[in-house]
Amino acid sequence: MATTMASCGIGSRCAFAGAQLSSVKPQNNQLLGVGGAHGEARLTMRKATGKKSVAASIDSPWYGPDRVLYLGPFSGEPPSYLTGEFPGDYGWDTAGLSADPETFAKNRELEVIHSRWAMLGALGCVFPELLARNGVKFGEAVWFKAGAQIFSEGGLDYLGSPQLIHAQSILAIWACQVILMGAIEGYRVAGGPLGEVTDPIYPGGNFDPLGLADDPDAFAELKVKEIKNGRLAMFSMFGFFVQAIVTGKGPIENLADHLADPVNNNAWAYATNFVPGK
């Protein structure tokens, strides 16, 4: 997504978020600020997928200068470089990490990609335990113990079934992961085998087989939902890591223990009794 600009004619000048901006030619995947009636923020999104560009105007509480901020009405004035152009911008950057445009662009991509991995990872940590507690047997269900099964005498059976993939070599798994993930990431960043120009964060095309981004209004809202759930998933994964170190149990078992005896099974009780290495 390119830098936010005021939508106006070539060579003219117009105002957006209290600043005068010279109009330049819009680029693909561009979010254009358009002044709405009665001071309401209206956004125009341009979505390019190698086909004809589609533009849509949306009134959204998540974009623009009048968007929802991190402390609501008590947030104060957000930094000038956080204009509400991108999804998940709540006007909070006390460390100034977004002040440099190039660093900001890099960090945006890193956050979205890590959010997606965290959402998949959180599901992978929780779902096997849920199945195991409901009588479905497919090998080790605790997420941080499952991978170690490959070092056992019988190796690792995917989903607990030797008919699927029976893995006995950590090097073979590593090689497959590098090849498969490297190919997909290369496709995403380079724009496909023909090098078509795409947005590396939201490439669309084969990465959107259900056509969820076909409607620009819905696409803008989905971006916000994705980053919000992704941030929650990253915190969840951090919590799972801490739980594994402190309790030696998976998240579902920890939850069950807490519900059964909340007085003796809680963060404070574990923190005060935790001894590293034991």
UniProtKB/Swiss-Prot annotation:
The chain crosses the membrane at residues 112-132, 164-184, 232-252. InterPro entries: Chloro_AB-bd_pln, Chloroa_b-bind. One of its GO terms (cellular component) is chloroplast thylakoid membrane. The light-harvesting complex (LHC) functions as a light receptor, it captures and delivers excitation energy to photosystems with which it is closely associated. This is Chlorophyll a-b binding protein type 2 member 1A, chloroplastic. Chlorophyll a 4 binds at N229. Chlorophyll a 5 binds at K225, Q243. Photoregulated by reversible phosphorylation of its threonine residues. It is found in: Plastid, Chloroplast thylakoid membrane. The LHC complex consists of chlorophyll a-b binding proteins. One of its GO terms (molecular function) is chlorophyll binding. Binds at least 14 chlorophylls (8 Chl-a and 6 Chl-b) and carotenoids such as lutein and neoxanthin. Chlorophyll b 4 binds at Q177, R188. Chlorophyll a 2 binds at H114. Chlorophyll a 1 binds at W92, S98, E111, R231. Chlorophyll b 3 binds at S169, E185. The N-terminus of the protein extends into the stroma where it is involved with adhesion of granal membranes and post-translational modifications; both are believed to mediate the distribution of excitation energy between photosystems I and II. The modification N2-acetylarginine is found at R46. Chlorophyll b 5 binds at Q177, F274. The lineage of its organism: Eukaryota, Viridiplantae, Streptophyta, Embryophyta, Tracheophyta. Residues 1-45 form a transit peptide. The keyword Transmembrane applies. GO terms for biological process: photosynthesis, light harvesting. Chlorophyll b 1 binds at Y70.
